[in-house]
């Protein structure tokens, strides 16, 4: 088989991070925010940890049209052609198809990693080793490799990957099935079974494998891409994509391709991953005091509080007394006080 040695990386940055209101807003969502207080936004951290795998010129960002200027500002060394604008959100399959088709036009030997822009990785060297291993597997095989995260708890907020038998290559397993987000009892069964992994939304494939899969399982999507492709890298691209992209069916890559394809594999990994999907997940990652409180801000004072996460975006003084298991978050004059148990409702509040 052909060797796909030209590594390209697609970073998905179109989400609005609605569960992180008020820190994350539709005008400035969480992937562009320094959530961890380290001086770099989540998308900048993502680019930083991918640089040892390939240069920024080989990275592509797919985002909503209205965030293009933020991407240019935060990743100034990324070529403008590599920043793809979705005229409207159509879930992950159309934007991945668009990015892959645009890459294919200039990089027929592309071997591709697709990753979210807003996850956190603690152990970057292990992350790089795992991705390199997956890339070496897909470089000469028509395989799709998903990165499965070894679960550390019975998490109900993630989808799961069930692994079947090991392939002839160490660490890489055939995928038996993808499972939706489970209830607690099912999540506990998955944890006990030992062959279930969190679906991190990180995929590795070569350009021909994904092109054939989209054509086989999503012929309508493939034909819309056929219509769009002649405009890529020309003045017409924005206009043509603006007209045709919104006609794509709203569908995730998991439903569109993963659950239908036979050649799907998983590489289980442990590199301190979190999807940073909610205030609760941020609390578990920030340093906590002896009462289980995590805080980020210039002047936050807690009295008789426990298991809280308190986040103030500017120089506000925040005083919290007597709360247990609460989120207190302030930004630009917007204030959220919400029980951690009810945090899935935040996207309705914002």
Can you name each region flagged by the protein language model?
Residues 43, 99, 118, 161, ...:
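Residue-level signal for inorganic ion chemistry
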Residues 1-11, 19-26, 37-116, 122-132:
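Conserved N-terminal catalytic core of the sugar/cofactor nucleotidyltransferase
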């Amino acid at each position: 088989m052909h060797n796909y040695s030209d590594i390209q990386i697609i970073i998905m940055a179109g989400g609005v991070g609605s569960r992180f209101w008020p820190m994350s807003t539709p005008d400035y969502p969480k992937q562009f925010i320094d959530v961890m207080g380290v001086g770099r936004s989540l998308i900048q951290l993502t680019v930083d940890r991918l640089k040892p795998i390939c240069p920024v010129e080989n990275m592509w960002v797919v985002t909503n049209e209205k965030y293009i200027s933020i991407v240019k500002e935060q990743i100034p060394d990324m070529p403008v052609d590599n920043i793809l604008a979705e005229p409207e959100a159509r879930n992950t399959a159309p934007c991945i198809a668009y990015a892959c088709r645009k890459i294919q036009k200039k990089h027929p030997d592309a071997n591709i990693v697709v990753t979210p822009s807003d996850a956190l990785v603690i152990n970057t060297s292990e992350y790089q080793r795992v991705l390199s291993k997956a890339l070496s597997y897909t470089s000469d095989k028509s395989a799709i490799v998903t990165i499965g995260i070894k679960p550390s708890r019975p998490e109900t907020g993630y989808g799961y990957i069930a692994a079947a038998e090991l392939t002839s290559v160490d660490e890489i397993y055939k995928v038996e099935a993808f499972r939706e987000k489970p209830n607690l009892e099912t999540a506990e069964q998955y944890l006990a079974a030992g062959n279930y992994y969190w679906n991190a939304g990180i995929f590795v494939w070569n350009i021909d494998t994904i092109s054939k899969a989209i054509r086989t399982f999503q012929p309508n999507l493939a034909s819309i891409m056929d219509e769009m492709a002649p405009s890529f890298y020309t003045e017409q691209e924005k206009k043509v994509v603006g007209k045709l992209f919104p006609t794509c069916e709203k569908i995730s890559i998991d439903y569109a391709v993963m659950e239908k394809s036979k050649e799907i594999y998983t590489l289980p990994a442990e590199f301190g991953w979190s999807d940073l999907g909610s205030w609760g997940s941020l609390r578990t990652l920030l340093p906590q005091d002896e009462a289980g409180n995590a805080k980020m801000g210039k002047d936050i004072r807690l009295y008789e509080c426990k298991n809280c996460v308190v986040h103030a975006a500017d120089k506000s003084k925040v005083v919290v007394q007597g709360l247990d298991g609460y989120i207190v978050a302030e930004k630009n004059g917007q204030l959220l006080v919400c029980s951690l148990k009810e945090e899935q409702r935040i996207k309705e509040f914002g």
